[in-house]
From Swiss-Prot:
Gene3D superfamilies: 3.40.50.2020, Glutamine Phosphoribosylpyrophosphate, subunit 1, domain 1. [4Fe-4S] cluster binds at C239, C383, C432, C435. CDD domains: GPATase_N, PRTases_typeI. It comes from Pyrococcus horikoshii (strain ATCC 700860 / DSM 12428 / JCM 9974 / NBRC 100139 / OT-3). Its EC number is 2.4.2.14. This is Amidophosphoribosyltransferase.
Amino acid sequence: MRGEIMKEKCGIFGAYSQDATKKTYYGLMALQHRGQEGAGISVWDGDIRTVKGHGLVSEVFKGGSIRRLNGNPVIGHVRYSTSGSLSEVQPLEVECCGYKVSIAHNGTLTNFLPLRRFYESRGFKFRSSIDTEVIAVSFLNHYSELKDEFEAMSRVFEEVKGAYSVLMLFNGKLIAVRDPVGFRPLSFGAGDGYYFSSEDSALRMFCTNIRDVSPGEVIVVKDGEAESKIVGRSEHAYCVFEYIYFARPDSIINGISVYWARYRMGVELARESPAEGDVVIAVPDSGRTAALGFAHESGIPYMEGLIKNRYIGRTFIMPSGREIKVRLKLSPVKEVIKGRRIVLVDDSIVRGTTMKNIVKMLRDAGAREVHVRIASPPIRYPCYMGIDIPTRHELIAAWKSIEEIKKEIGADSLAYLSVEGLKRAIGTDKLCMACLTGNYPEWAFDFKV
């Protein structure tokens, strides 16, 4: 839920086409949900030029700055983190071994520090503190020896562990890379040019021939042609929270509709943990699709009982109190809630503080009962692959039972979707569910350096 929020690291977009800069700008706008705190675009015009800054895409590229970036190919990035200097906003320009690259990265490296120390011991100088630079240095180091993008990336896959979908501008070429496990999504589209995006929903305005970049695949676009090779292999483990929460509902990731996966989560939840209620409502927007599935399966009518204030922007100065924050963002429809038994559906509970205040809000609006249903299993473990999940002691499910959480949030009943129910809803078991189970994919921690 977006109140106590888990945050995705970023979104990336790339274009090799006419008007590539403008299309990349539009693509980043379509990926704005993946990061609201920073944005940037790099273009190739015989050299690499980059404009980036803190804020939304529309804020960074206001005043005509986008018109000064003419080139092809182009890559762009949206970022969530508020920490770090402007030099750490992506795309990141990196020079070493006599070469220069601009790189945009979605994910997190699990062996960032040992790999950085390894390269520092060999005389490489790092200009930022982010793991993205390590990927670029590894690539340029191996390319300087092998003089082939595919062979260089094969070495990178052996060396760099963790989650990374990457776009790079290199010598007039556009290079797309997805790690061998496929943690983070990456889509590839062809039409009047070639396009890449963290989600296919951002590609549909430009092309209809769209597919996933396969785990371990490298695509090099140069001279108007795209060449592809699978150069890294491992057991696939797609991030489960792309389906639960992060991706847009209209996206298709790894061949699976995000909308229907969430809808089926609600269906499975209703089968596993039915509730006696008069109306099903969702925590907007994160719980809506699952709530529709729950309502359909249970036969309990769905209604809009909470209205989201969409005009509190990123720069709004929020008050310090948690309850007033929730009430500024959400408002109950008393005519829907008063005197009724409410089944409240959301995608997840992280710390529990936001849900506690929503339950109180519903009771204040006259709800007879509040039954909370969560369309994912309890989050008990941190993520090391690019999702900003709080430390384990901040995760309420890591140290409290479901009965204790129910009492903490003030609900009449509480139930979560099971791990098996989640797998059935998504339709695959090729998932990274480490934050739910504590079982981390081996490849991501098999350090070679």
